[in-house]
Amino acid sequence: AADMAMRNENERFTFEFNGETGVIPMEHISYFEIRQRLVTVHYGAGETSKFYASMEQLEERLSGKDFARTHRSFLVHLPYIVKFQRQSLRLRTGEEIPIGITYMQSLKRAFSDYISRLNLYTSENL
């Protein structure tokens, strides 16, 4: 479990936009927002970067990395979620992200799985 945690800390998300390559540590990313194939990645202290991709490409790249779809335009990093509300969720950055009714069940399941894995790793270290 410790190996997995260390590997996750070193993971980077890379992207290209206008001929430049961007690199962001995965743990700094709070969410992705996509509008007509233009993706905005939100990270750090309110920073953003943009690149082109489809939601399907993005979901494929982030598969198994604790990101979940909340809405047709949003993909959220599960460790950033602090509160579920009726039609949105609050991130630890203070931002509010919409939840589409279509994604509610799968989002709650993904979050529950994430919390279970977190508790498993924590209890192994005791």
Q: Residue spans of the language-model regions?
A:
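Conserved binding/recognition cores within well-folded domains
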Residues: A1-I99
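Inter-domain helical "communication" segments and dimerization helices
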Residues: A1-R12, A110-L126
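DNA major-groove recognition helices of helix-turn-helix
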Residues: L58, S106-L107
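A short, terminal or domain-edge coil/loop segment
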Residues: K65, R69-T70, M104, L120-L126
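C-terminal structural segments of small proteins and small subunits
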Residues: P98, Q105-S106
